[in-house]
A protein has these predicted regions:
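Secondary-structure capping and domain/repeat boundary segments
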Residues: 1-210
Length: 210
């Protein structure tokens, strides 16, 4: 509010006015070019401005921008989500009320770690290590091909990923049972008289009695 004493008939120049968060829309009554013969009050007209808060989720799910009047209460959106990461907040504070400017907030993320486990069978763990999500595996990080008496290693199931997924991953060795040849020789002439191929672990007594 400003007051000024002006002589009757003197030229009047309306002042320049500004108000944070508002656009000046003129005066409620026309300002005369010269001072009338009475005290006069002129009231400014204002239009509230709208401003926008934009959310850069940096790879997370999209969050709609907030556009509303200056000074109105701002409701914080739900935290964004991003595969393989944990939301760690914004790089600035979401205001309680809309400020008199546009602003952009960027999401901050902590990368998650997940466990890669190699199992020899349903019970025996060969190795178990944690890796960052998206970590690209190198050959030296893979478990060596295991061995097991009487069995041949056939690979891993499920197939090993090239990168660490956004979940713990367990793969189990697959085996094929080995077969072996048993040869029977005569005790006098050492002559081969019978051969049989059997799987590892078969009951030898049954084989001998055949």
């Amino acid at each position: 509010i400003s007051r000024e004493m002006v002589d009757y008939g003197s030229a009047i120049t309306a002042p320049t006015v500004a108000k944070e968060g508002y656009t000046f829309g003129g005066w409620e009554a026309d300002v005369p070019s010269t001072m009338p013969a009475k005290d006069t009050t002129f009231t400014a007209k204002w239009t509230v401005n709208q401003y926008t808060i934009t959310f850069n989720t940096d790879g997370g799910n999209k969050i709609a921008p907030i556009t509303q009047d200056f000074g109105t209460a701002v409701e914080s959106p739900a935290d964004p989500t991003r595969e393989g990461y944990t939301f760690a907040g914004w790089d600035g504070t979401i205001p309680a009320t809309m400020p008199a400017k546009d602003s952009t907030l960027k999401a901050q993320w902590d990368i998650n770690q997940y466990t890669l486990t190699f199992k020899k069978n349903d019970e025996e763990v060969i190795s178990s290590e944690k890796y960052d999500y998206g970590h690209v595996f190198h050959e030296n990080e893979m478990a060596q091909d295991p061995d097991s008496v009487g069995y041949s290693f056939m690979g891993w199931s499920p197939e090993l990923p090239t990168k660490m997924p956004a979940e713990d991953f367990t793969t189990t060795a697959q085996w094929t049972i080995n077969s072996y040849k048993i040869s029977f020789y005569g005790d006098l002439d050492n002559k081969l008289f019978h051969e049989v191929t059997v799987e590892y672990g078969s009951d030898l007594e049954d084989i001998i009695n055949e």
